[in-house]
Curated annotation (Swiss-Prot):
Keywords: ATP-binding, Host cytoplasm, Hydrolase, Methyltransferase, mRNA capping, mRNA processing, Multifunctional enzyme, Nucleotide-binding, Nucleotidyltransferase, RNA-directed RNA polymerase, S-adenosyl-L-methionine, Transferase, Viral RNA replication, Virion. It catalyses: RNA(n) + a ribonucleoside 5'-triphosphate = RNA(n+1) + diphosphate; a 5'-end (5'-triphosphoguanosine)-adenylyl-adenylyl-cytidylyl-adenosine in mRNA + 2 S-adenosyl-L-methionine = a 5'-end (N(7)-methyl 5'-triphosphoguanosine)-(2'-O-methyladenylyl)-adenylyl-cytidylyl-adenosine in mRNA + 2 S-adenosyl-L-homocysteine + H(+); a 5'-end (5'-triphosphoguanosine)-adenylyl-adenylyl-cytidylyl-adenosine in mRNA + S-adenosyl-L-methionine = a 5'-end (5'-triphosphoguanosine)-(2'-O-methyladenylyl)-adenylyl-cytidylyl-adenosine in mRNA + S-adenosyl-L-homocysteine + H(+); a 5'-end triphospho-adenylyl-adenylyl-cytidylyl-adenosine in mRNA + GDP + H(+) = a 5'-end (5'-triphosphoguanosine)-adenylyl-adenylyl-cytidylyl-adenosine in mRNA + diphosphate. Residues 560-757 form the RdRp catalytic domain. It is found in: Virion; Host cytoplasm. The keyword Nucleotide-binding applies. This is RNA-directed RNA polymerase L. Belongs to the rhabdoviridae protein L family. GO terms for molecular function: ATP binding; GTPase activity; mRNA 5'-cap (guanine-N7-)-methyltransferase activity; RNA-directed RNA polymerase activity. The gene is L. Its EC number is 2.7.7.48, 3.6.1.-, 2.7.7.88, 2.1.1.375. Signal peptide: none annotated. The keyword Ribosomal protein does not apply. ATP binds at V1619, V1620, I1621, G1622, G1623, G1624, L1625, G1626, G1627, C1628. May form homodimer. Interacts with the P protein.
Amino acid sequence: MDFFDLDIEIKQERLPAECSLNSPLNYSLSAQLTDRMTPRTENVRRQRERLRSHMREHFRVKDLSTLDNDSTRLHARLTEDLITIQSPEIDSSVLENWPPLKSYIASLDYTLPEKTAFKWEQAAPYWNLFAQLRAILLQSQKIKKQETGTRELYSCVPLQIEFVEGVVLYFTDRGSKEEFTKSGELPSVTPYADFLAWIKIISQRAQAVLMAVILRVTDKGLSPLPESLLAIYQNVDDILKRAGQPAIDLLKLWEPLVITKLGELLGDRFGLEEDFRNTIRGEATKLAKNLFISRGLNRLMDILDQQTDAQPLFQFFGLFKHFAYPRVFSRDTIQAIQEVSDRPSSISAVDFLHDQCEIRKEFYIRYINAYHRAPGLDLSALSPSSFLRDSLERGKIPNERSPLYSNKEWYFVKFTKSIEWPVSDTLSTFLSDKAITRDRPAWIEDGHSGRDMSEKRLLLKFIKENFSSVADIVGAAEAIYNKEEDLLIALKVKEMELKIKGRGFGLMTFMPRLLQVLRESIAKKTQKLFPEITMTSSDLDMKKRKFMLSKKSDDRRGFIHVNKSLDINKFCTSQRQFNSNAVFSSLDELMGTFPLFSRVHEIFEKTWIVDGSSSDPPNLAHFTRILDECTALGLDTPHIWADGVFSGLKGGIEGLCQYVWTICLLLRVERVMQKTALTHYILAQGDNVIITIIVPVEIHRDGTIPEQESRRILSLSREIDLSLESELEKSGLTLKIEETLTSENISIYGKDLHCPQHLTLAIKKAASAAIISSEQYQDVPTFLSGLGTSLEALSECVNNKVGVHLFGVIMGVAGWRDLATHQTWRGWRYPYHKKAITGRIRASEMKLSKGEPTELSISVLSKRRRERETLIELLSNSLLGSALGMLAFPTPLDLEKRGVGDYITHRLTIARKAILSGHLDPRIGRKVESACNIPLSSRTDLSKLFDSPFSLNIATEEDATAVIKRQATKILRLQEIKNEKLRAQIDNMDKGIATLDAALAGATNINPRLNYMIRSITDEKESEMFVTKFASARTMRTLAMNHSSELPIVTLLEMKSQQKETYTIWRTKRPPVTMWKCSTVLAKELRDTSWGKNIIGGTSPSPIEAMETIQIDPTEWEDRRSQDAMSINYYLSRAGMDEQTAKLTRGFLVPYYGTQTKPLVAKAYLELKGNPRTNKALLLLSVRESLVKTGSNLDKLIIKLCSHALDIDVASLPALRAQEEAAAGEGLRGGIKESMSPVGPDNFYTNITHKVFNRKWATPYHVNIADFIIQGLIETRRHLLVNERMNGLLPVSSVKCTSCFREKEREFFDIPEEFTWKNESKTSDPAYTYFTTWCDLPRVSNLPEMDQRSATRLLGRGLALNRSSSGEIITKFYSMPMESQRLLHPVELLLGYGEGVIFGYLRSQHINHGALFHIGDESLAKKLRRYVLDTKTQHAKQIGYLFQDEDSLHELLGQGLCPYIPRSIPLTITELTNACAITTIRATEVILSTKTRIHHMPVQAIDESDVDTSRLAANNMQTILGDPRPMNLVHLDCDLTHNMVAWESEVELDILKSENFHIDGLLVELTARELPIGDTPWKQRDWTCSNDPKIIAKGIKTKSLFIHQGVTGAINLIPDLLVVIGGGLGGCAVPYLQEWPDTPIIFATLFDERERISEDGDLIVPPELLVRGMAPRMIEREILEAELCDITNEGNRRLLIRLVTKNKRGGKVVLIDEIENRGAPESLLQSSLQDLFEKLDKVCKLNSVHTVRESTVEQFSQRVNSIKRSRKAVTLHWNRYNRRDQFEALVIVKGEEAKSDYRISTITSAKAFRKIDEQLEIDGRLSSTQWSLPALPSREKNILFGYVSSVFLKMNLALSANDMDRERLIETIEGTAPGLISWKEKLEHRDHAHRSDIEEKGITQDKIFNLICLSWVLKGLRYGVWDTDAQSIVAQTVYITRGPKLCPLGEKPKRIFASFKLQSGKRVEDAKGFLSALLHLEGFFPLGEQ
């Protein structure tokens, strides 16, 4: 697809694929057309007939065979003759326009020599000849009406040319003297394609000579002299003229010959082996001799030998680009092929095919044998442990299920219509399968063996459509194949690659480059279509594959992984394009895509291929006949193209060699690696090799590598590269050193390119000249690909801008102007068409109706103007280069390896330089500006062009992503996509690009979180590359623009790569550990691994990785939060470990006990903060987690270091003295004192945050702040490592997490997740599964090592639970004789046994009853006693041996565990049994009294009381046991009920529109009276909420929704602004928002109260609902999550006032104050509120609504006075959701009320509440007599039911929604309540019960309390009387009547069965909580039984 996109532009009769430009097979076609051979197809026959009649008519020629048809000789002769008669003046008017060109180039800091300095006359002949031929070509392609009978002749004086029927006739005027053609006056004839090839050759020569002429002046010594070029061309023409077609074989050796000469010049650096040079030159001489052109060859070699400089010689590559050239094979291979092919092969075609099979066999067998352990393969060079050796000996490369091979999938294509299979398909598809089907099952994903039937079906279809019978094809193929199962057609998937520098991307312009990226991406989406077998994923991706491979990689520090990814020049790239286009065009047609496929494999020239596309089956006899026919004509055998069989292809068996290739390569690489003696892993597949070398290295403490170590690794790495290079060259493989990627860093950030400087570019070009073949630059402009290597070599090696640029301009003005701007992705738009005709230009395709004018005239501009315009357009376009048009300016060194963004940046830099230089022609300047859309008025403001990111379109501020998106959409729309799926894919991509566009807009650095968006467009591998492209484009641009004049491009690129350093490729967070399913096996495994660990392990990130987080200045916290939910990245503990491995192998473990040391470090930090040496001390303090020490040494060590750093005695700091206290009470939370727990105002939480961060910690979760402090310190350490200074503020880092901080801590320190018990089994009872797995004894084999005591404790549990013989268990733990077992720690054993017994009892309870009620410890103890006595014989069996040994017994007695003093030892059986029973009972009591946890359902929350009990218990336990070790103390909580499910919210999403809320309240006016100020003494108010977790008195959270109903009506105005302070979620605002839908809102609520439905049934409206409803209305979004509700902070008050002022100064504002009074000193909160309201009153018309709830009227009045803002009257609002047991109401203070200093007295308030009560009674009476209350709406019922049922659960009554029926409820409570008390037996026949009948001596107060509550409920349900005076209720007596049944409260039955009364009145507060909750039942059953 060079020069012209011929196959697309010029549609001909379908030629075989081989008839492309340089294929000698055209000769066969012209032989058929000229009667020398029988035509092979109907088409050719007809074409010949038409040609015949034309010749007869115009030339009187009867016999076509008399015509000259040797195009090779003809064109050589024509070239020679025509060049000699050309004029020496170059015909280009560019010379007239020299001045603007000169000033333009001056603007780029270059000087242009005078035009006379150039010797144009040397370039003129070729240039002028080319111009004439090009004119003929364009003219001939115009579409015009032709009169029948007229001839169209074209003249290239004196040659005449005529185009007839796809051939070209050449003849001369009869009058002219010269004879150009051999046949005199008769015309010579060649196919049209040959004519095109000739023009292409002329064009290429003209350009080469012109280039040489220009460079000779601008930069001497860079290019060969024009004379040398002309001489070479002349000699070549001479050779071709003499030898004809076969001489082309000699030209194919041209580049290898140049390489041999280069090798001489460059010497060792080039590294050519001697035998290679001799082979090539020998071949050339031999060939020349056979063709009798030795003298011509010698002359060529002389010219070569005259070149003494490497650089000009280097430009000789590509002179014969249009001819193929062979690859260099190893010597062995060449010999093997020669042995076969040197035999005379033309005797018989059958022999020839036989020889080809021999070659194939030679390749196949030679290596496959080695592969299957042939004795010939010497494996002794490999070390015995070598992975490779192992594989080879087993007989195959390991591929089953290896992660590396997951991308190998076969596709068997079912075609919907028959394809005319072109040549080259059959053999290659058959064979490519052959290589990989050695071991079929391994390759088929599902693993089923045998062949997929679809292959067979496809094959049969193919045969049926192409052959008369199956027998035909089988018979014909048997000559080549002998195996039936080889007859397959299968297509192999290759991963396409998304790399800007990939196949086809070299110097592409912007649009095609972009298109290619999209094309590949789409191709990947259309089922990763066909091309070749090699793996070409990106380097990063391959590195990741390598990580997966190296399972044995070393975890310790002090080892560095160096990864090398080798890039080898492969030997099959050259001919792909030509030989495969036909195949691919068929596929494209089938898939409905435009050119999408581009590649197959070719290898050997002499491969004969059976062609299925021909009309007849390929039978050998028929073939022999044709062969003879050709031989008779003297045609060269290998180049015959005939029916059914053809040759001359370099292709067919690449697939076969793939494995062979891999093995050769592996052996070579392994040999080099063995010498290094380092641990290494090699991954090879095809020509991709990745080596991982593990190098031991010294590392500093902080994780950095010392300088000398770096140098050592670097030199080692380079050494390995060089030895690899020389080793591989022995196989004829050249290594592209500069593309051999190596990571020599401690970790892989970005890619480190390492380039040893030894003329790498030259080697790259010389050794793989094919890299710049047409295959790579499919869409590059004509002159670039025509020049081939030279231009790219210049731009990369020479970078001479003037020469290249000038050349581009001359090309443009010479008529190629359109190419500068209008290259389309389908090919070229011809310059002089008035209207662009895209697609293929051919008259036959244009369907013209009669009479329609078909004029397509050439538009003619006046000559002068046209050239001037052209020049200006060219120059202005070239300034903006590839961003907008053609690439006339060369690419700077290596820039094409980088992204589009960098390219644009580079372009803008050049443009800016030129515009600002002042040399530029003003018209060019204007053009550039208009291209950038700069309005003319703002000419001066040019900086705008260069300072906005990527801006190509300034006026619209469009950035690069937008441009890319726009271009992409535009291009994709041009395609007519017939394939539905593909169209959908493209639409998807459009969407993806749009999202990406939005996310990338203006991003300085891509946030790693964007990765997921990118993945939706491309797949994972691509996204890596995709993201990196844009990662720091803005930075690049800034750098380029700031100092473009003095900044060399190299520095720019270095800066660029530093930018990329910060962009790590590991950016996904570790996924959360999944909850274990309820499978016994899994549960046991988990339990075993988590058992008995006292120390929690955390992985310490190395400092280098730790530095990666973003620091946030706490003062900007809010702003940052709203932009970005910050997350802490998960750092691997070792560079380069993949996540999977990281999960399985822990890094460096850091012990810490609970959180003990954290508060200490934090306090120490506080006290050190003012000290000038703080930084140093902080570093030391925070290094804590990387010191591998344990226990208190850790703190001692830190103290020592700090003292040293600060020169003070740190131990004297008061905070560190707290250490002893903490260590003494190390319990559940590792000794955190009460002050450090997050409850209460003056605690550690508040202090530390205010001091450390100067404000409260801004987090949505309520957590123990000590945990955050450490995190802060670690962040500080990172911060210091980066910045080395502190600005007085700690950097904040927040965690994105949806649950409590424990998880954050686990994530941060990499502590394994505490396993959550989650039952997924459908059948079994969850609790049963739980009991049988989680709490059993772990399997001993799995236990971690333990000290003897813990082990004994565990053993005790096992004895109680497992019932196995004692000896058996003990011997598992210790290998000691039986008799010494009794000397183990008996106390531990017994306590463990006690735990086991308790657990066993609970388990048996569960098994018997199917449910567990919450059992108090006291009752449990009694039940256990009974249980132990029932099972005493069992206990005697298990622990009896303890009492048979005196020492053990005395130890038990000493501890007070055995109150039984035996008379003698051994004991009798009875005594033994009793002793065991009593001792076991005692042990269980000890366990219960210390609240030791029996491992149970995970605990949800831990509060202060737990901490206290555990600390107390720890101390008790130590005194009981005399054991100083801390124990793991937890509290027993069996909340597991059989049928209670968690209450789930059913709130619909339209909650905000709900009508259900409407409830009318009562309004009562309060008017202030004058009172002396000190009239009522201030009372400290009691807390209304008990801290006992068993009691709920928090009040329903959604209550605020209901309480605020109807207030809007009472306020009676529409406010301008609503302000909400306090009040959790701000549910209180909902009723207001319903009423005033348009009012804006400011939220200052406590978002940290976002619980879910807590376990006690509280409900929270999901925040999403509220926020979704309100977000559009919020004025200040940031405040949403702020902690403004703490209005004791003055800054918060100021902020709130400022906001109100800013938004609605003087407007009507409604303020809702939901601030509860708990949790802060009364006076402070009161005064703050008062202050806030008064100040707000001044800036607006304030109406406020306050929630007030107090326990006494005095407090209520006191509170109202403090908030009423001196108003004379306030209003109380009350409805039935307000509590009646306390004084609770909404107080509404209106702004328009008159002011006065009066106060509201207690009496007024009391009256108001009395009024409310009266009103209620009246309502109640009314309703009961006249009408019934409406039923509650179902949603409210659900809310209230969840609340009520949770309270019942606390009282051991599990209710379901079905029980909410009055009759059933009364029945349930009456019947089950007495069951709370255990009676000896059911005494139903007795009418009373004595105390002694109740099992417990003192029935617990809890039980009685529960009974009181239940009987209170009964009374309400029966009579509708809901008493609210808790004080009197608690004092009453509860009666139980016969049945036994519970009586309603206050009702004394005739027959009392039992009665109970609370002993103490302390339960009042509890009762308030319980009753206020149960009062909601009134809503369900308001009026009692009617």
